[in-house]
């Protein structure tokens, strides 16, 4: 076994200030996020995790591997407090900052190509979601899609009303055209 001072130098654990900084950073992100997903990354290579991080950045998702005790402290008092009991094993936390379904969507899409990525739980609005709930969250439309759907629903009655108003005039035109065609035929 090596000398004690060499082992201390190689110790990769965080000092107290670094731990406090990690807790503060994750707590700040959690307080500004709409939803969170906890995933187990066991079995993924560094290259695969890097791809996941790139996909998360593109989707405006905060992705962080945090020790469970530090994550528990960071989530305390936030909407994601309900996740604290399930923080066991090697977990990575993904937070959606803009859209509630962004983190779940990024994780689902990445998980299709990498089955070793396992969704453990999620949280939305202070409610704990099982893995199936995270899948349903991923299927939710984006904000732009939801606005487009709403506009379509709002436009439909107006369009129908406009066609209803135009119908008597169109019917009169068709009747006059039919009479004209009948007179020309005889």
From Swiss-Prot:
What is the name of the gene encoding this protein?
rplJ
Kindly give the PROSITE patterns that the UniProt entry links to this protein. RIBOSOMAL_L10
Q: Which Gene3D superfamilies match?
A: 3.30.70.1730, 6.10.250.290
Q: Which GO terms describe its molecular function?
A: large ribosomal subunit rRNA binding; structural constituent of ribosome
Q: What does this protein do?
A: Forms part of the ribosomal stalk, playing a central role in the interaction of the ribosome with GTP-bound translation factors.
Q: Mind telling me which GO cellular component terms the entry cites?
A: large ribosomal subunit
Q: Which Pfam families match?
A: Ribosomal_L10
Report the HAMAP family cross-referenced here.
Ribosomal_uL10
Does Metal-binding count among this protein's keywords?
Answer: no
Q: What is this protein called?
A: Large ribosomal subunit protein uL10
Has the keyword Metal-binding been applied to this entry? no
Name the family the entry cites.
Answer: Belongs to the universal ribosomal protein uL10 family.
InterPro entries linked to this entry: Ribosomal_uL10, Ribosomal_uL10-like_sf, Ribosomal_uL10_bac, Ribosomal_uL10_bac_type, Ribosomal_uL10_CS_bac
Q: A GO term (biological process) for this protein?
A: translation
Give the multimer and partner information. Part of the ribosomal stalk of the 50S ribosomal subunit. The N-terminus interacts with L11 and the large rRNA to form the base of the stalk. The C-terminus forms an elongated spine to which L12 dimers bind in a sequential fashion forming a multimeric L10(L12)X complex.
Organism field: Nitrosococcus oceani (strain ATCC 19707 / BCRC 17464 / JCM 30415 / NCIMB 11848 / C-107)
Sorted keywords for this record are: Ribonucleoprotein, Ribosomal protein, RNA-binding, rRNA-binding
């Amino acid at each position: 076994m090596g000398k004690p001072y060499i082992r201390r130098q190689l110790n990769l654990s965080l000092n107290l200030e670094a731990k406090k900084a990690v807790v503060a950073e994750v707590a700040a992100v959690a307080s500004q996020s709409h939803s969170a997903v906890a995933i187990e990354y066991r079995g993924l290579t560094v290259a695969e995790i890097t791809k996941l991080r790139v996909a998360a950045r593109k989707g405006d998702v905060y992705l962080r591997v945090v020790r469970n005790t530090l994550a528990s402290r960071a989530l305390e008092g936030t909407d994601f407090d309900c996740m604290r009991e399930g923080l066991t094993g090697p977990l990575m936390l993904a937070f959606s900052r803009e859209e509630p379904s962004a983190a779940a969507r990024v994780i689902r899409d990445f998980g299709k190509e990498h089955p070793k990525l396992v969704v453990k739980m999620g949280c939305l609005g202070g409610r704990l979601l099982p893995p199936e709930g995270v899948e349903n969250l991923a299927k939710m439309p984006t904000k732009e899609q939801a606005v487009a759907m709403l506009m379509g629903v709002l436009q439909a009655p107006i369009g129908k009303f406009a066609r209803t108003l135009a119908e008597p005039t169109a019917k009169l035109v068709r009747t006059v055209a039919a009479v004209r065609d009948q007179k020309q035929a005889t």
